[in-house]
């Protein structure tokens, strides 16, 4: 299992949209990169200069929206994940 460090989270990104709301099927090069994902692992939080740790605002299982160009894609056990800093998370989907 992957364990993120510091203020990072590991996301299982939602698949790219294959068709538009109107039902038009998109070519593979026209698909938009999804900006939502499900958190599967959370780091311990940000460590301040005085040694205190600020806990994360999100938890495992949350579905979140993240910045379009945020994160680093990693592969682990034949699956792709996204490692993102908490500051690059925009919202939690409720």
Curated annotation (Swiss-Prot):
Together with the chaperonin GroEL, plays an essential role in assisting protein folding. The GroEL-GroES system forms a nano-cage that allows encapsulation of the non-native substrate proteins and provides a physical environment optimized to promote and accelerate protein folding. GroES binds to the apical surface of the GroEL ring, thereby capping the opening of the GroEL channel. The lineage of its organism: Bacteria, Bacillati, Bacillota, Bacilli, Lactobacillales. Keywords: Chaperone, Cytoplasm. Gene3D superfamilies: GroES chaperonin. It is found in: Cytoplasm. GO terms for biological process: chaperone cofactor-dependent protein refolding. One of its GO terms (cellular component) is cytoplasm. This is Co-chaperonin GroES. Belongs to the GroES chaperonin family. Heptamer of 7 subunits arranged in a ring. Interacts with the chaperonin GroEL. Its main location: cytoplasm. GO terms for molecular function: ATP binding; metal ion binding; protein folding chaperone; protein-folding chaperone binding; unfolded protein binding. SMART domains: Cpn10. It comes from the Bacteria.
